[in-house]
């Protein structure tokens, strides 16, 4: 595909920190001599005890072990706050933009960040939270969410941030899996003019001692909603920290001590608690944030992600703060009160870098010039995309309308498990192709394999396959909490000696990579990964459902929508009310983000092989309205089931 613009003639590229030639030289070194390359890059952050070992990793089946800088000691909160204070105490760390445009403009300096984190860290210690204890954070997109993460990091507690859209049931699952000692939440959150009952959801999750390891709940009174209070368990944030000191010593952490657990959907139904550790993660988040966005000291950077997802962790909190950046913390959504909001926020704070998801871009694009007519956006110099592949139409609109045809787009590919960006075009490349994540960053060795694990190494032609990474990088997840066997089984058992991403991809004749979608049973809805098994488990728990199967289908706004095939139990006649009830049931069990878009009731059941396996490939084709491309159906136990599904399909 011909590029839409030549990045090398772009103003941002002319002033780039790292030229393309220099990048290629450093990349080669990172592959050929990783110890020397990362040994040097590791010094971008401060260490209490310098490391002498750099890379000690194995992808060998049954022996998977990932260690970086393993004898070094440091503290993440110290690196994100304290080391900046001598020169930048009064620099703004976050400009906070509330859900309502009329909300007061709030600026949080690095000194304020230090003081608030110190107070909360001391409160956590007073409540008996120690190094290695797990703390869950279920908060709105407000500064206190960041304070909570950094307070945990300061004392060596392991935080697990739970997305504010998850239900009580989903919260309880996560609290129990990692045996959380303390929960930090707020009375309510705000989103698009509505309130989110955060404290209520936590109370429901803890009801009847459902999470026995939880001892206390710290509640930030944000909206001042009158919420139920459990004496002896619940603590008022503001009251409790009032007399705490702003000084809290930073715990010395080994580079391989866990920093956080973040749950990501798996194909088995039970969410995986992905563990990221301290040293390698911070080095990688800091480096990739600076490199990809070509960071300058006076940039105002806006990552429009939620703190409950990995993008919020790496590129709204840890990467930017480690680099001493000024960021935007946005509570709202891009389309509230109208689709011009995102541009007005850019103008209000003179944002120079915008990092958002294709879902948001498509939602704005659908509104036409409403998204751009109330703003100029002339402060922008770099645009970024994250969460899912961006289709060329949305890419072109983002470039021409939001970026005024003057900003390079870094279309990044990475995952919760990778910790940071892995592949992206660079702003100094001249042959940018809309929709392509192009090529790897330092230390990343991508490859394509066929079903037998044979590397597809042919160059100069289009090749397709499963996307694997053939060697380790510092930001890589180390394990699944409490289940290293699952970690190995999920990521390293499919192809021995390689990390399997679960994504399919192609590499074109120019060597550029294109992500084609998930190869496992995980959906990517609005840039958020949802396990089909988890949703299916919720559906079959409904008293009227006998069997259910979930697939994704192309959705103009979300990228992928959720298409549900359901069989009712005997005696139940499906109708519109039951369909509504089922959608509500899923919302309550998992959260609004998992709400099905389309529910098709099946009168003849689901298509299965003679061995009883559901043929999801067929369900995907029908949901995508590609029923004329079903392929081989010879193993179907009852072909008439497929005819019935096609005749009654909903996505027409």
From Swiss-Prot:
The keyword DNA damage belongs to this UniProt entry's keyword annotation: no
Residues spanning the membrane: none
Catalytic activity of the protein: acetate + ATP + CoA = acetyl-CoA + AMP + diphosphate
Matching SUPFAM superfamilies: Acetyl-CoA synthetase-like
Entries under InterPro entries matching the protein: Ac_CoA_lig (IPR011904), ACAS_N (IPR032387), AMP-bd_C (IPR025110), AMP-bd_C_sf (IPR045851), AMP-binding_CS (IPR020845), AMP-dep_synth/lig_dom (IPR000873), ANL_N_sf (IPR042099)
Domain of life assignment: Bacteria
Residue positions binding ATP: 387-389, 411-416, 503, 518, 529
Pfam families (alphabetical): ACAS_N (PF16177), AMP-binding (PF00501), AMP-binding_C (PF13193)
Post-translational modification (record): Acetylated. Deacetylation by the SIR2-homolog deacetylase activates the enzyme.
Residues the entry annotates as binding CoA: 191-194, 311, 526, 587
Cofactor(s) the record lists: Mg(2+)
Keyword entries, A-Z: Acetylation, ATP-binding, Ligase, Magnesium, Metal-binding, Nucleotide-binding
Biological-process GO terms, alphabetical: acetyl-CoA biosynthetic process from acetate
Residue stretches in coiled coil: none
NCBIfam families (UniProt xref): Ac_CoA_lig_AcsA, PRK00174.1
Family: Belongs to the ATP-dependent AMP-binding enzyme family.
Name of the protein this chain belongs to: Acetyl-coenzyme A synthetase
Species in which this protein is naturally found: Marinomonas sp. (strain MWYL1)
